[in-house]
């Protein structure tokens, strides 16, 4: 068994869609990034790659490569899932947290979980997504950005 941990953060800006867990969430701002800036999926991918000792998302999807400009992170997650399969890893579970003052994430979490399960071709009960605020503290608490953390367990 192998444990992996992932973290990602992006700044909130105007004129961008807010996409988390592959879900477009209605909000006046979105996350700034080279791809769709889906911090949840990016943290999950980093935890999976880390557990398998396969590097991180920057190795496979560099922000200097124009082909990843505006990339759909669900497609990137599918690639990571295929890479794990090729290396004989099975996902035991994923537990992820979104840290954001606003908007409320609870209504969107079931769809996020479904998207992740489908992209990785695993059962829904292997994925947990939760959200919290930082009670107005720090950059996420003041609404400047959103971050996400993920931990996973892989079996070979």
From Swiss-Prot:
The lineage of its organism: Bacteria, Bacillati, Bacillota, Clostridia, Eubacteriales. It catalyses: 4-CDP-2-C-methyl-D-erythritol 2-phosphate = 2-C-methyl-D-erythritol 2,4-cyclic diphosphate + CMP. Homotrimer. This is 2-C-methyl-D-erythritol 2,4-cyclodiphosphate synthase. The record marks 34, 133 as: Transition state stabilizer. Its EC number is 4.6.1.12. It comes from Clostridium perfringens (strain SM101 / Type A). Involved in the biosynthesis of isopentenyl diphosphate (IPP) and dimethylallyl diphosphate (DMAPP), two major building blocks of isoprenoid compounds. Catalyzes the conversion of 4-diphosphocytidyl-2-C-methyl-D-erythritol 2-phosphate (CDP-ME2P) to 2-C-methyl-D-erythritol 2,4-cyclodiphosphate (ME-CPP) with a corresponding release of cytidine 5-monophosphate (CMP). It comes from the Bacteria.
